Amino acid sequence: MKQVALGRSGLMVSELCLGTMTWGTQNTEAEAFAQMDMATERGVTFWDTAEMYPTNPVSAETVGGTETIIGNWFAVRGGRDRVVLATKITGKGKTVRADQPISAATLRTAVEGSLRRLQTDYIDLYQLHWPNRGSYHFRQMWRYAPRFDDPAAIRDNMAEVLRAAGDLVAEGKIRALGLSNESVWGAAEWLRLAGVENLPRMVSVQNEYSLLCRQFDTDWAELSVLEDMPLLAYSPLATGLLSGKYAGDVVPEGTRRERTPDLGGRVTAQVFPAVSAYLGLARDHGLDPCQMAIAFTRQRPFACIPIIGATTLAQLESNIGAADLMLSDEVLADIDALHRLYPAPY
């Protein structure tokens, strides 16, 4: 597996990242262990998790469960030094800390909790799961209204978080900082504040990106290239839509859609025609649709590392195979044509 630089962090990571959010709900600990074993054997040594995982659904009873499973794997298998481990502090919400925003205090509490569950003494990449001020992600862009009572307080909080993160870096508890579900303004402001106060610089951003969700392609892409801030693309298969398993608006037993019928707002009148078109494109070119979708994210004009999640070893094996696929100019041109027809199906 090829290794790539994670922006300006000094970290080298595998060109695919292993997603973990189903471990503890859709997947048992034994199944998660098997996935980590396979990933390690195949060189996928960049792993992403979060303190609030597992999802599908998120619940107070399962918070921290995925990190615990990963920590148990390290305890049994060893090899913490072989893995570049990313996790996240939960943003404001009811599940983890009862509507407390990300702050200096909650940052330290969250880091120390993750370290205990992960059974490690350091986190390679520590990410802010979503901004305190809200976000247009999670299908909120259709009604997004940026209204802020106190912009100065927003900036003060950001600086406070960076200072606290700097302390944690100095203590060796985290190595690098990253963003998630962030906006271009937010990323630019985090970078500006870090430069002004000589504080840790955000090195990456984890946002949704796939053939069906391409909000990153314009302003974000420009910032990514000019600031050397790679995208960690979550949902490169659009929560399984691009695999074809839901084609025809079906709900197969045991799938994510059985637990979340609308796939977090992704099931719309437009999405199935778009999915059908991309499945047809893959078929016409003799490609596996999942591998085509993942390979697409790796051939963008900005640095992009797709996060591949799976509920079975067969799915994981196939997704890892996308690292060996290079899409032809003809395939990319056909993708561009379909994107014009279906620019934002959800």
Residue ranges and their predicted role:
Residues F46-A50, V84-K88, Y122-L128, G178-N181, ...:
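Short beta-strand segments at enzyme active-site cores
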Residues T55-E61, G91-A104, G134-P146:
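Surface-exposed, active-site-proximal loop segments in enzymatic domains
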Residues T95-Q127, E208:
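Active-site gating/metal-coordination segments in enzymes
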